[in-house]
A protein has these predicted regions:
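Conserved small-residue
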Residues: 77-176
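C-terminal substrate/ligand-recognition segments
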Residues: 180-181
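A short local loop/turn or secondary-structure capping micro-motif enriched for an aromatic residue
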Residues: 37-38, 175-177
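Extracellular/periplasmic, surface-exposed regions of secreted and cell-surface proteins
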Residues: 1-121
Length: 181
């Protein structure tokens, strides 16, 4: 255990606006929020593990989260029937401000500065259609599957231009696993 652990801290700012229109038949509620969190409990990645044991967690992460919420309601009456319709939506985007991570060879591989849960992967560049494409001298060498490619296999972009398709070519892609809407 780590005797220096503390509670995670959060600083939040919310600004809301509620209003009614058309004799209170239409009501709208909006909230804009900004949250900064630090002392997030996380494992260290920059200290070597010599004996194979997991190191204790530390309070060392920080993150920003911001967005809005919108709620719209329509209340009315047709004859003797009262009805209401309601819709809501929200949008939130987070950014990892600090994560204890080993410096990567290329900045595009860092998780700090990206959304929490960001996926990384290779950029698809079509398929190998013939043996001539596979046997071309200028084709990047694949670090996987012993570089044994066949027509129909996927082609990937050599992002760092080192002549190899490997983990150094993985870039942030798509959305994170944390929904925004």
């Amino acid at each position: 255990g780590n005797p220096d652990l503390t509670w995670e801290r959060a600083r939040k700012t919310n600004v809301g606006l509620d209003f009614n229109m058309f004799s209170s038949r239409l009501s709208v509620q909006t909230d804009f929020f900004h949250e900064y969190r630090d002392n997030i409990l996380a494992n260290r990645s920059t200290e070597p593990v010599i004996i194979g044991a997991t190191l204790p967690a530390y309070n060392l992460g920080s993150m920003r989260n911001m967005g809005f919420e919108l709620d719209v309601t329509w209340r009315d009456k047709i004859g003797q029937v009262n009805y209401w319709l309601r819709g809501n939506c929200s949008f939130a985007r987070n950014t990892v401000l600090f994560r204890d991570e080993v410096p990567k060879q290329f900045d595009y591989q860092m998780e700090t500065g990206r959304r929490y849960g960001q996926f990384f992967g290779l950029i698809f560049d079509g398929y190998y259609n013939s043996w001539d494409e596979i046997n071309a001298l200028d084709r990047p060498v694949s670090a996987w599957n012993g570089n044994q490619l066949q027509p129909g296999d996927c082609k990937y972009v050599d992002v760092n231009k080192d002549g190899k398709i490997d983990n150094y070519d993985m870039v942030p892609m798509g959305y994170s696993n944390v929904p925004e809407i």
